[in-house]
Swiss-Prot record:
Function: Involved in the import of GDP-mannose from the cytoplasm into the Golgi lumen.
GO cellular component, one term: endoplasmic reticulum membrane
Protein name as annotated: GDP-mannose transporter 1
Assembly information from the UniProt record: Homooligomer.
Listed GO MF terms: GDP-mannose transmembrane transporter activity
Residues passing through the membrane, by range: 15-35, 50-70, 85-107, 111-133, 140-156, 178-198, 213-233, 249-269, 277-297, 302-322
Residue ranges annotated as Cytoplasmic topological domain: 1-14, 71-84, 134-139, 199-212, 270-276, 323-332
Encoding gene, per UniProt annotation: VRG4-1
Assigned keywords, A-Z: Cytoplasmic vesicle, Endoplasmic reticulum, Glycoprotein, Golgi apparatus, Membrane, Sugar transport, Transmembrane, Transmembrane helix, Transport
Residues linked to a glycan: 239
Amino acid sequence: MSDLKLAENNFWGNVANSGPISIFSYCASSILMTVTNKFVVNLKDFNMNFVMLFVQSFVCTLLLVILKTLGYAKFRPFNKTDAKNWFPISVLLVIMIYTSSKALQFLAVPIYTIFKNLTIILIAYGEVIYFGGKVTSMELSSFILMVLSSVVATWGDKQAMQAKSLVESDVTVPVVPFNVGYLWMFANCISSAAFVLIMRKRIKLTNFKDFDTMFYNNVLALPILLLFSFCIEDWSSTNLSTSFTANSFTAMIISGMASVGISYCSGWCVRVTSSTTYSMVGALNKLPIALSGLIFFDAPKNFLSIFSIFLGFLAGIVYAVAKQKKNQNPEK
């Protein structure tokens, strides 16, 4: 990433220019953030998602300021004009990360990861509408696989819930309640697509770099998150002590640091490898994130659930290849 000061020699210079290390770091940061978020929202009686997101944004902002002070990151100082131009993006960011936390709270990590692919479809057709883009036949094939993987994942989830219902009750016909997590996931896909599409326009207006975007996203999100928390969430001492244990607070801090790590490692990976390698890593990374849900949490482990993970994985690879072919052969 051009905004970072990197070592040029000796051991750290070799690390900073290592493709395999950059790829591993990117994957590890992504998994760490997903797992820590799932850990927090799944804690018994935890109900303060806005505060959790506030802590993460605060940690991210603080870490960026420290990196800038040490000379390892560069971004613009805060000013009212940029803040005014960027504020709508931060509002969308808050909606996106809140709906994401709620979806992760109710859905298993593999299902959450698979359904996140649907955001790609919304963004692709959003670009067709707003930027005059084009969807190739190979991209369309990947979209079909994404939708299919989501349908199979839903069947697997329903099958797992039916089996659980039979074990926990004496009924012969299990009653499976609707999982509200799917509604949160749907809202997250829409808000994520809107965030990406509108941010693309705003970046052209403000000429922000990567760390400018991160800094303003998080700084402007802080008061919004706190306001919504005060209005909606229970700030009683009893609820605070229940929601904020040493383990949950530590996980929030780690998650905030991981968000900075993901952004840095994205640029690092592109710099020392190529955009082609990075896009493939992004596609392949879906698999370890989904598998982490099977390892660390009680996610459905039936045939349909496992099959949906590999369908989503295949969809990601097809999409990455389609994007690379599209970039190599731009329309004249």
